[in-house]
Amino acid sequence: ILPTATQYSRNAIFSGLLPVDIEKKFPKQWKNDNDEGGKNLHEEEFFREQLKRIGKGDLKVSFTKVLNHQAGQELVNNIHNLLQNDINVIVYNFVDMLSHACTEMEVLKELANDEKSYRSITVSWFEHSPLYQALRKIADKKINIVMATDHGSIRVQKSAKVIGDKETTTNIRYKHGRNLNFEQKDVLSFRDPADAGLPMPNVNSSYIFAREDVYLCYPNNYNYYANYYRNTFQHGGVSLEEMIIPVVRMTSK
């Protein structure tokens, strides 16, 4: 799904709907990029509604979001209590937070300056994380675990110039707005958002998605932002690394 960004892809997973259909079905809950407030606050509601839609609304469900280490420890302590449910959804936010931190923190940018080192940091975190502890505690139980993610990321290398109005969004791998000017070779573009299953935030809104390892910068302070974001891990655009995601099903031995 495009954009390969959490507010679109994770909401789509839990709702079972394209973003344009989420907006139609849940107009009060859906928020576009420039709207104020959290963009992923209604995932549990979306998921429960999806279960009802497919005839599974009577299942006993829990929905847990782990946004920090303390919440992770609470998950470890409570993991056995979750086994009484039919479905337990656990959203673990660390890897997405890591990709953003590697852009904003110079130390992490140095430590994760290529794909190999980025994966190494992620593996090291996982091996010492509450998530791994929780999985080990239930490894002998007769349950199915499905692990997946909502999008990947790519190390960006090539800056490209985009011109838009003040309402144009800020993400450097995709943008939507009116009167966007860009080089067609750099992006996949949709003049009609509905063609990509996306809502239309404003009249005449269009979407563009950076191809391969391109990232999009505005003319203002272009050189500064081109240097700032070069060699960082980003998501939202069109690449195999962002769009093809792992889905793993695990059972106890």
Regions found by a protein language model. Give the residues of each.
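Feature captures the catalytic ectodomains and active-site-proximal regions of enzymes
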Residues: I1-K253
